[in-house]
Amino acid sequence: MKGLIYKNYLVTRKYYFMAFVFFFITALFMILIRLSMICGNISHDPEAVSDLTRTMWVFRYMPCAVVILGFAGYSEAFFADLNSGWARFSRTTSLSTHQIVGSYFLSEGIVLSFAYIICLLYLVIFCLSFGDKISLHYITNVTSLFCFGVIIQYFNLTLAMFAKKIQTVQLISVSIALIFQWLLCAYIYPRMEELENPDAVLLEWMAQQFEPIKAYIFPVMLLFAVIFTVGGYFISVKGLERRTF
């Protein structure tokens, strides 16, 4: 089991490294802006400081999304690993289908948990730079993002056990994203006509629109993460047993 997990890390190490680099660049960009607001050129312009403060609080979760979704948003390595045909020889060893699938799910769970810890540390530093305390609200938001990453990754893993080509998974994932975007636009755009200057107050207005459902986002994401983890595991076991390499 340990060998399978180590193999998964070797196969996907390039993607982990790229996601961490993008997170570091994004977080460093936010930190440099904050330093300039405190003791740099921007600090001499109160209006610019006020505008940037509001903007940074809107995009404060961007580095978290970069590292979590970066760790979860790939499938090429798993397809290359499965399509290499090595698993057919596992039938001549003591490895079971449950162990093979479990190694995929466990290795990705460990990596996403590591990304989650990094995001919490970043958020603590970000809040301290603004003189704010880390609260349960911030933790639940990052946890919701972590659950979303779990859903994406385990959904892709489950499809990888059935599909022979990565284009199939990409087509399904993009189709679901487009349907969700269409539903979101159908909800937002008719209501935007009521605004006199939508570009100026768009972010604040969108926050107000989603205020009634904000309390349900975390429990719903947590529930779906559990469903995709448990259900995806057993479905993946069946898919790998029926897979012809």
Residue ranges and their predicted role:
Residues M1-G85, G102-F245:
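Hydrophobic alpha-helical transmembrane segments of membrane proteins
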